[in-house]
Curated annotation (Swiss-Prot):
GO biological process, alphabetically ordered: 'de novo' IMP biosynthetic process
Presence of the UniProt keyword Ligase in the record: yes
InterPro entries reported for this sequence: ATP-grasp, ATP-grasp_carboxylate-amine, ATP_grasp_subdomain_1, PreATP-grasp_dom_sf, PurT, PurT/PurK_preATP-grasp, PurT_C, Rudment_hybrid_motif
One term of GO molecular function: ATP binding
Residues the entry annotates as binding ATP: 112, 153, 158-163, 193-196, 201
GO cellular component: cytosol
Subunit structure comment from the entry: Homodimer.
Protein's name in the database: Formate-dependent phosphoribosylglycinamide formyltransferase
Cysteine pairs bridged by disulfides in the record: none
Domain ATP-grasp, first and last residues per copy: 117-306
Primary enzyme class: ligase
Record-linked NCBIfam families: PRK09288.1, purT
Length: 391
């Protein structure tokens, strides 16, 4: 049973993180009449614009987080980002607060070490070689053991922040400094990942729901500077590789537990699949599902954590998304030339409503459906380029 928003028996959903992914989750909650409370570290974040009310707090401050949750008494707490005081969520869950999908899943995946050790050591799933380091000297030794080229990432970051590639020993010091500057929780521990040869990488959106495990068609994507630029669905795979990917994803999400949608990132080499990362929430590359499926990743997430059945996911055919990327300084962002973008057949645009920009920032996404994925990607890129950002 669900209560109506703003009434005494309202079913309340509290979003921890209010970016573009949280905004779409909020919209899906609104469609079911739920009361939405959006939280972020800055005011007027995208999800706040479609929520019933909002709060600005430092979500890494456990006391502030506990105080807010005790104030709002939500039926569901839905993390949208990694930078949250997860130990507080674990304590609150033990006291009866419903954390989506679970507090442990949020804690394990908030940093790359927890989830990498779960996959490689506990579940014995193949991954790229990796080492962790806290201090610079240990970092240098880790790079030597893993070998170059290698990828360096803060254990907690997103959208490519703090990530770099070490090609030669001359890159080591700069890579360390960049990782220290880019972590979500400040300076500290990093992971060094060895390069592996792979044919392509995918996101396998996997929903753990009351009626079982459900897979979306695999999503291919291209990244630049550690952040996604385009994604497409379906990514063509052999039956053997797809089955292997689904087996890995099912093991991971079952180990994490709870109900919700998970974005499982995998490398594919022939029919072999290697685990990369997982997010216990909608994934940025999954924005293509806003046009490619009858139930978007956001609708799937909400339906799952509410304990509702998924039944069947219908994929409409080749589709793609392309990021509308801003690069400037402004607190009054405007957009022009939407007419050109939306004059393209089977094309949609989402503008996220971010209140300001200081450098490079994802401001929207263009979505297309076509007869094949190559054409869909090309047209999505062109539609995104049509949109002019005015700073």
């Amino acid at each position: 049973m669900f209560g109506s928003a703003t009434r005494s028996d309202a079913t309340r959903v509290l979003l921890l993180g209010s970016g573009e992914l949280g905004k779409e989750v909020a919209i899906e909650c609104q469609r079911l009449g739920l009361e939405v409370i959006a939280v972020d570290r800055y005011d007027n974040a995208p999800a706040m614009q479609v929520a019933h009310r909002s709060h600005v707090i430092d979500m890494l401050d456990g006391d502030a987080l506990r105080k807010l949750i005790e104030l709002e008494q939500p039926h569901y707490v839905v993390p949208e980002i990694e930078a949250i005081a997860t130990d507080t969520l674990v304590s609150l869950e033990a006291e009866g607060v419903n954390i989506v999908p679970t507090a442990n899943a949020t804690k394990l995946t908030m940093n790359r070490e927890g989830i990498r050790r779960l996959a490689a050591e506990d579940l014995q799933i193949p991954t790229s070689p990796f080492e962790f380091a806290d201090q610079y000297d240990d970092f240098v030794a880790a790079v030597e053991r893993v070998g170059t080229p290698c990828v360096v990432k803060p254990i907690m970051s997103s959208s490519g922040k703090g990530q770099s590639v070490i090609k030669t020993p001359a890159d080591i010091e700069a890579s360390w400094q960049y990782a220290q500057e880019g972590g979500r929780a400040g300076t500290g521990r990093v992971v060094v990942e060895g390069f592996i040869k792979f044919d392509y990488e995918i996101t396998l959106l996997t929903t753990r729901a009351v009626d079982g495990i459900h897979f979306c068609a695999p999503i291919g994507h291209r990244q630049e500077e550690g952040d996604y630029r385009e994604s497409w669905q379906p990514q063509q795979m052999s039956d053997e590789a797809l089955k292997a990917a689904q087996d890995v994803a099912e093991k991971v999400v079952n180990a994490l537990g709870g109900y919700g949608l998970f974005g499982v990132e995998l490398f594919v080499r022939g029919n072999e699949v290697l685990f990369n990362e997982v997010s216990p929430r909608p994934h940025d590359t999954g924005m293509v599902t806003l046009i490619s499926q009858d139930l978007s990743e956001f609708a799937l997430h909400v339906r799952a954590f509410l304990g509702l059945p998924i039944q069947q996911i219908i994929q409409y055919g080749p589709a793609a998304s392309a990021v509308i990327l801003g690069n400037g300084i402004s607190s009054n962002i405007r957009f022009d030339n939407l007419t050109a973008a939306l004059s393209r057949p089977q094309t949609q645009v989402r503008l996220f409503g971010k209140p300001e920009i200081n450098g490079r920032r994802r401001l929207g996404v263009a979505l297309t459906r076509r007869e094949d994925t190559k054409q869909a990607v090309s047209d999505a890129i062109n539609a995104a380029a049509d949109v002019k950002v005015i700073y």
